[in-house]
Amino acid sequence: MRNRIRLALIPVAVAAIALAGCSKTDKADPNLPEAATLLSESAATTKTQTSTHIVLKVTGDKPTLKLSDLTGDLTTKPAVAAKGTAKTGGLELPFVVVDGELFAQLGSAYSSMGPVKDVYDVGLILDPNKGLANLLANITGAKSEKTETIDGVDSVLVTGTMSKDALNTFTGGTTLTADIPAKAWIQKDGNHALTKISVDTSPGNTIEMSLSDWGKPVTVDKPAQ
C-alpha cells in the first residue's frame, strides 16, 4: 500500500517541481527599469550620437549583409567616415570610408573599392531616422530580463520583437516579410546608452552589434594611393 502511495505521489511531486521552476523563471526582477521606458530613452540618446566604436558579427548560412565581421570607429560629423577592419568574402581587410568611398588595404597600400553603399552604407548605423535609434523605437512586446556586463558597463537585457521594416531599412539589403526576435542591452543608469543589439533574421542567422566609446572623437584620413 505504501509503495502505491509513493508511486502515486511521484507525478504530483514532479509537477510541483516543474511549476515551481516555471514560476521562478517567469518572475520579473522588480529592481530592473521598465523595458518600454529603457527603449524610449535609449532611442532618444542614440538619435543624438554622432560617433561610436562598433563590433559587428553576422553569423549563419544565410548572410544578410555583404560582410560577416567588422570592428571599427564611425563618425557622422562633419561627414560620414569610418575606419577599422572588416571581413568579407573570406578576406579580413583594413578599411577606410571617406567621402562616400570605400578603401581597402590590399597588401601594403589602400585601393579604392568604389562607393561604400555597394557594400554597406555605414552612415545608416547612426542615421537618426533609419539607424540604431529607429531599431530601438521599433521593438514591441519588450521585457526587461536581467542585468549583464557588456564591455564593463552594467546593462539591462531587453527582449522583444522588432519591426521587419525597421531592419530592412537599417541593413539596406534584407527583405524580411515578418517581424523578428530582438535583444537590446541598454546601460542601466545614466543616459541609457545602447551597449549591444542582436536580431535573429531567421533560425540560426543573427546580426549582433556591440557599441562603445559613444561621442569619442574619430579622425579618418583619406589614404594615399
Swiss-Prot record:
Residues 1-21 form the signal peptide. Induction: Part of the lrpG-MAB_2807 operon. Disruption phenotype: A double lprG-mfs deletion strain is more sensitive to the antibiotics tetracyline, vancomycin, rifabutin, clofazimine, novobiocin and ofloxacin. Pfam families: LppX_LprAFG. A lipid is attached at C22 (S-diacylglycerol cysteine). A lipid is attached at C22 (N-palmitoyl cysteine). InterPro entries: LolA/LolB/LppX, LppX/LprAFG. Its main location: membrane. The keyword Membrane applies. Modified by Lgt on Cys-22 with an S-linked diacylglyceral, signal peptide is removed by LspA, Cys-22 is further modifed with a fatty acid on its amino group by Lnt yielding a triacylated protein. Bacterial LAM blocks host cell phagosome-lysosome fusion and is one way in which Mycobacteria evade the host immune system. This is Lipoarabinomannan carrier protein LprG.
